[in-house]
Structure formats: structure tokens, C-alpha cells
Amino acid sequence: MKKIFLYILAVMTIGVGCRKTYNDTIQGQTPDQRVAAALAAYQKKLTAAPYGWIFIESTTGIAYNQGVSSTGPKIVLAYYMQFTDSGRVTMLSDFDPSMAATPKTSSYNIKQLTRPALIFDTYSYLHVPCDPDPNVSHSPFGFGYGWGTDFEFSFSDSVGAANLGDTINFIGNLNNARGKLIKATQAQQTAYLAGNVLQLFTGAGYLNNILQYFKRLSLGGVGYDIHLDPVDRVVTFTWVDASGNIQTAAVNYYITGTGIQFATPVVNGNQTITGIDNLTWDAGSSTLTVTSGSQTGTITGASTPIKADATAATRWWNYAARNGYFWASGSGFHVNGVDDAYGVTALTNSSGSFYYYAYWPNFNSGVDLFVPIMLQGNSLGLNAYGELGVPPPFITGDGRALFTSGGDVGLGGTFTPTPPGGPVAKSNATMFSSAGFYVVQNNEKSYDFVLATDAKTWISWFWPQ
């Protein structure tokens, strides 16, 4: 027995002597030390740029709120950022004119998550379009979503920090927004700090000084109708191609210190437009002068479209008639630079308070209806008076749509005569004007009607379902 015990003890001693200890160091560094060194290298990359960075963020059109998704318009935003080695970042933003004028400093951090991540961890300009309150973010997605932008990003290049170039790519950790840091030049930094983004906001605002709906850009001998949507940050170009067909390109835009840039270039044959710059307003001639690349162009008002879409009104009417519902306008007619020129949004009577202005194709068999929709309590209903229309609209040879009044009484006596001189009477007179409308389709569920007299009066329709 003693021999057996000594044998077992000897084997155990040999086993202990042969046991290998696992060493996870590489070049003398533990995993934690290697991670810390890598994160420090990322930070050094950001802070070593002497003139800062331009950060371009683009969304996918999907926003998430606690795992629930909502779809809406895409947006592209531009920021100027200067990082310090103390974890602070100073930025400017093109999201709002106030953010373009005043630099804001907040904190950032670089952490190891699934991948190394750049996290803006205190409220900054980057957080504003993410804000769940639509009163802050102006989000079209609804409460809780923001624009589908992010403020935590993973480095997405397939190289380590030491091999990153002057452009660094990111993916947002919540909404999968795409981010791109581009090392700024001294000229770009100077332009940002001199307030050029704010000046470009002002320059784009000069378009509102052109009272006509149709803004005609002449560039390199080519004419375009352009429409700037500052809410969804989209500019739409419409032109006529060599075959005489209408072509349209709607592109997101963003503003940097050196110009209004298009996320996607507008390509028309041999002409490519990547953005516009140097916007100068001449009040005497109501002309906005711009540059695009090496070319100088002008934007002026036009009383007619570059080419009328002769079938747009029919598409508009048929869509509502087929779906058994109405087109809605939130504020009625815009006239000579004034939104809600007739004061329809203040309309209040025994029917309730104004909610929409509606045009209802084929409301009853053989009759259309142009009428305010009123809110009373929690219910929507028709105003006590409106105007009947004779369907469908008549399309003239030059592409105008004419709407014919059927009077303001009928439908079994439901409606009473319209009070003269009020917002409904003025709206009726414009809607059924003998001048007719040029109809512009923005997308499947959005149209604008432009009064053909001088293109200074229009109404915008959206599909409310």
C-alpha cells in the first residue's frame, strides 16, 4: 500500500510540474491593455486633425423607438467637429440656422462595444435630430422617433486606427445611420468659423423672395425648375430632355462651409450638378445668382412650368375617386408669399374648428366636394357650407386643369349658402377660377396646384390616410 501511495504522489508531482500556464499577452500587453491602446489610437486619430473634421450623417428612412420601427423621409446632415484629447468636442451644424452660427461644446468617448465606438455622451447638436420630442427634432416620424439619426457610432472601416485615412466611416448603433468623418482643410475650417453655413441658409432663404411657385434655374444654357423643401431637406430639379420628356430628380442636400451639397449628383446628359454656392440676391431684378462648379447660373421666377404635366390632375383625381376619400390641405391657399392667405385655419363655427381643407373627388355619384373638414370634440365632420364641383377636371391643350363649380347648395340641403367675403368664399373663388391650375406631383401622395394667372397662388395637397 505504501508503494502505491508513493507512486500516485510521484505521478501527481510530475503532472504539476508539466502543467503549462496560459499566457494571453502579445508583445507584453494583456487583452485589456491592447484594447485600451487601440481606443487611445482612435482618439489620437481624431484629435490630431489640426483643422477638425466634417461629419456627414445620412439616414436610411427607418427610425426605431424601443424596438418598434417607423418609416419616413431620409435626411442628410453636416457638422463641423473639433475633438480634444480631454474628451470634448466642439461642433457646428446645418440642422438649424442657430446651430450654424454658435459653436457648442459637449463630451465624447471612445469605447469598446461589439466594435470600437464613437459615443457623443452628452447632449449636443448631434442629439437634436435624434430628440424623441417632435417639437424639438421636427421629426415627421412621430413622437419618440426623431429623424432616425444616431449619436453612438461604430467604426466600420476594416482597418485599425493606425491605418485609417482622411475619411473615416461609421454605422449608427441604433438606427443604422451612416456617418463619415472627413478631415477638414484650413480653408474649410475658416469657412465654417466665419459663418458661411449661416450665410448659405440666408442665401437659400432668398428663394422665398421669388413669389412665383416656379423658380427657374438657368445654368450652362440649360433650364431647370427647382423646388427647395427645407423641412425634408430635399431639392427637386425638373427639366425637359432631348426627346421632349419631363425629367425629375429629387435629392437630399446638406450645407457645409463651402456650399450647398447634393447627396446624389443631378445628372442631365453631359451636365452634372453636385451642389450650388455663392448665392447672391439682387432685389432690383428679383434674381438669385449662384455658382455650380465653374459655371455661374441665375434663378428667377417663372409664371409657367418648364413643361406642364398634362396628366397630373387626372392622376390626382383618379387616385382619390378610386380610394373613396379626399385630398387634404393643412392651410389652404398660399398667395403672394403669404401662407394661409385667406385665414382658413382660424375658421370656427357651429361645425367645429378647422382641421383640413378637402377636395373630395366623386363625393357622390357625379359630384365633387370642396369643403373644410372640421374638428368637433374627437370627431371630424364636414363644414356646414362648401362648394360642389363638376367632375372630372377639364385639361386644356397647354396642360392646365380647370375645375368647374357646381354651386354651394345641394346634397339634400345639407349645406347652406357660403357667407360672402369669408375664407371659404375666397377659397371657392380661387379653386374654381377660370384660369385653371398647373398641377405638380411631388410624390405618390403629394401634389401642388399652381394658379395659372401668375404662379403666385398655390395650394398643396397631401393624402391623409
Predicted regions located by residue number:
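Ser/Thr/Gly/Pro-rich, low-complexity flexible regions
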Residues: 169-171, 176-179, 187-188, 194-465
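Hydrophobic/aromatic beta-strand elements that line small-molecule binding cavities or substrate pockets
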Residues: 77-83, 106-109, 148-157, 251-253, ...
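Sec-dependent signal peptide recognition
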Residues: 2-8
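C-terminal motif of bacterial Sec signal peptides marking the signal peptidase cleavage site
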Residues: 14-17
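Long, acidic/polar, low-complexity amphipathic helices and coiled-coil-like
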Residues: 88-248
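Acidic/polar, low-complexity intrinsically disordered N-terminal segments immediately downstream
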Residues: 19-117, 189-203, 464-465
